[in-house]
């Protein structure tokens, strides 16, 4: 009957390399897995609707992440300093990507953004110097409706966003 992984539940468990979470889980709380530096994979259950601040911060061995459609918001610093994270797919349910979500994810090269995103905040990709490929699940017109913070993309080398009906050049 586990519905939530609470604040600091596994924080700093540096030997934790994998964990199986029940499908009924709905919430990953503040820093729930922060500092689990050996955690290599984590499957977010399909019922999770909220991932709180810093939930996976400094999980230095995570290499990829798929965020299910059930998640509605990526709060501040969720994946900050996940230095091995190279690929992320954000589900269509996420509407907001908050500051520092992927900050200092220096290995991040590929990002897929769901069509439900309405806001991308400043410093989401702070020091993401390897991010070359951004794909958006919606159209070019939908992309242009997203509220993009000034300089949201200042630290990334990607020059275009690949949309379902063509590319949008980034400023």
Indicate where each model-derived feature is located.
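Structural signature of tandem-repeat unit edges
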Residues: 1-4, 13-27, 37-50, 60-73, ...
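Short, conserved catalytic or adaptor-binding loops enriched in Gly and charged residues
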Residues: 149-160
């Amino acid at each position: 009957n586990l519905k939530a992984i609470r604040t600091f539940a596994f924080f700093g468990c540096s030997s934790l390399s994998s964990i199986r979470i029940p499908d009924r889980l709905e919430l990953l709380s503040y820093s729930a897995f922060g500092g689990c530096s050996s955690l290599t994979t984590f499957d977010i259950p399909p019922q999770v609707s909220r991932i709180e601040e810093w939930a996976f911060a400094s999980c230095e061995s995570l290499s990829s992440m798929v965020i299910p459609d059930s998640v509605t918001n990526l709060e501040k610093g969720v994946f900050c300093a996940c230095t091995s994270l190279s690929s992320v797919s954000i589900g269509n349910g996420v509407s907001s990507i908050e500051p520092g979500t992927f900050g200092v994810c220096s290995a991040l090269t590929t990002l897929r953004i769901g069509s439900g995103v309405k806001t991308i905040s400043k410093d989401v990709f702070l020091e993401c110097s390897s991010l070359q490929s951004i794909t958006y699940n919606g159209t070019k017109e939908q992309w242009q409706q997203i509220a993009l913070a000034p300089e949201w993309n200042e630290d990334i080398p990607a020059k275009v966003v690949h949309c379902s009906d063509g590319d949008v050049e980034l400023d």
